[in-house]
Structure formats: C-alpha cells, structure tokens
A protein has these predicted regions:
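Rossmann-like AdoMet/SAM-dependent catalytic core
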Residues: 52-154
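Active-site segment flanking the S-adenosylmethionine/decSAM binding pocket
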Residues: 1-51
Length: 154
C-alpha cells in the first residue's frame, strides 16, 4: 500500500527472482497488482528441473486466480495475461512464427488441444524448412491450414 502512489503500472513484468514456491507466488501477486490493463507477465524457469517450484507456484496461482491465463509457454517462460486480453495476445502468438521467420529465427508453434480457444500455445526452435505449426503431434506449414484443421475438429 505504501508503494501504490509511487509505483507506475507495468505493461510488461518479467519475473526471474527468488525461486522458492512462496517467492514465485508472491512475485506473481505483486506483478499482477501493478499490471496495467493489457499488460503481460512473463515468468522465467518454467519446467526447469532445477527450479521446479516455479512451475508448481505458476499452476497454483492460475488455479487461485481464474481471471489470469497462461497464453503461451516457450523457452522455459510462461506468458500470462488477464482473461479480457487473452484474444489480443493469442493473435500475437499465432503470428510469432511468421514474424520471427522474417528475421531468420524459426520457431514451431504448438497447439496443445483441439479446443483452440481454451488452450495455451507452446513454442520452440525448428529448422527453416520444417513445419512451423503443430496440433498434438500433427505438423502444418501454414497458420491457415492449422486453424482450418482446428475449425473442422470443433
């Protein structure tokens, strides 16, 4: 409360702090408290075997705060936003392979469920000639083809 008048709202918060369960959970609470509308929280060391508490705290935090969603995971980071901004960030992450590909950085975006609108996406490196999209093991070369497959599965 003492900080509230002095601390500006954050559009982007990257958490890479003390890696205990309580420390991570507290950092998430603090980041959300000062997050500007439309802001993004990025939590480091997700699924890192040396920092398992980060992943545990993340999933508990998401369970306890239903208006916060994980929109994407990749490179040991989780990307969180408020539910009302989920569509905005999903659109951004869907375009990530094309945006980064133009710069010579190749990533594969993976849909982790057939229910496109309810799932977070994950991403990781891939080769320039490899498919840049995937739905539970099935790979696709274009976003249009991927979304078409998801539409037919619904």
């Amino acid at each position: 409360r003492m900080l509230s008048p002095q601390v500006p709202l954050l559009r982007f918060a990257h958490i890479d702090g003390e890696h205990s369960y309580d420390g991570v959970y507290s950092d998430l609470q603090l980041a959300q408290r000062y997050l500007a509308p439309g802001g993004l929280i990025v939590l480091d060391d997700i699924f890192n075997m040396n920092s398992a508490c980060c992943t545990h705290a993340l999933f508990d935090y998401l369970r306890d705060h239903p208006l916060v969603h994980c929109v994407a995971m990749g490179y040991r980071k989780a990307y969180l936003c408020e539910s009302r901004w989920l569509g905005f960030y999903r659109k951004f992450f869907l375009e990530t392979p094309d945006l980064l590909g133009a710069a010579g950085i190749h990533v594969r975006l993976c849909f982790n469920a057939w229910a496109n609108e309810r799932s977070y996406v994950t991403f990781d490196d891939c080769g320039a000639d490899e498919p840049h999209y995937q739905i539970i093991g099935r790979r696709f070369h274009t976003l249009k083809e991927t979304l078409g497959t998801l539409d037919h599965a619904s």
